[in-house]
Amino acid sequence: QPPQEPHLPEVCEEIENIDKPVIAALHGTALGGGLEIALASNYRIAEEKTKLGLPEVNLGLLPGAGGTQRLPRLAGISAALQIMTSGKPISASEALKLGVVDKISTNLLEDAKAFAKQVAEKNSHPKTSMLTEKFDNDELNKEAIASMKELIQQKFGALEAPKKILECVEASISMDISEGLKYERNSFSELMAGKQSKALIHAFFAERKSAKIPEVSRANARDIKTLSVIGGGTMGAGITIAALNAGLKVKMIEQDNENLNKGIQHVTKVLERDVDKGR
């Protein structure tokens, strides 16, 4: 569905430009746009069991409401790239260490009120987009960018979203905030219009719909004791090893005895090596 007004990037900018301090009180899961709203706030307080993350990469997208520009200013280049390219959430305690949240709470509402009173007495309040401390070490940031660029190439190959995230984070260093936000938005639109995001979004919803099929949800899983693997090459041997380690009997099928023996020898060699290592 096309986005409806007010658009989230504009909401985040409005929050950041309010002349009174804004404290985001987080609990449960603060993911995607929810976390981007919190990043646009002046302060963040989180319940101790809160999970925080920007999982858009799993849909072939990037955080499009300031996440690629604000998170590096709080957590630093390396940590921000790790969070956004992995799509995995972090704990509240990890977020506190990184500087993503300012305080952890066991009684969120009361602690948030007390925190609000405390910061209200200050004359100035930090705008996330204006923070530059994490950008001071040019050499360290260049190393982080270069290292992540190599890792993204090795790990993600032809996937576009991780590369675009890296480009946006580079923009957060080299551009002012308004230019960086514009660059992020254009990059988001490019990914949204691309084939990869459409395919990953389709897969995301298809997986959830499949779990709701009555015949599937009511069915009892069959007890599997034997597995047949077609092919004894690298992939077939790997599947065979995993199945044997799980206690299953395996029948390996190959086109001739020569290839079958090679496959069996490969599996045997790996298992013997694991035994020698005490695995």
Where are these regions (language model features)?
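Gly/Ala-rich phosphate-binding loop of Rossmann-like dinucleotide-binding domains
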Residues: T240, L244
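Conserved N-terminal Rossmann-fold NAD(P) cofactor-binding segment
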Residues: N257-R279
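Conserved N-terminal Rossmann-fold NAD(P)-binding element of oxidoreductases
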Residues: V229-G231
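Amphipathic alpha-helical segments at domain termini/boundaries
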Residues: E36-L39, M84-S187, I201-N220
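N-terminal Rossmann-fold NAD(P) dinucleotide-binding loop
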Residues: G236-A237
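Conserved acidic E/D residue at the C-terminus of a beta-strand in Rossmann-like folds
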Residues: E56, K251-N257, N261-K262
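An acidic, glycine-rich surface segment that forms the CoA-thioester-binding/catalytic face
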Residues: Q1-H27, G67-Q69, L74, L200-R222
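Crotonase-fold acyl-CoA enzyme core
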Residues: E14-L131
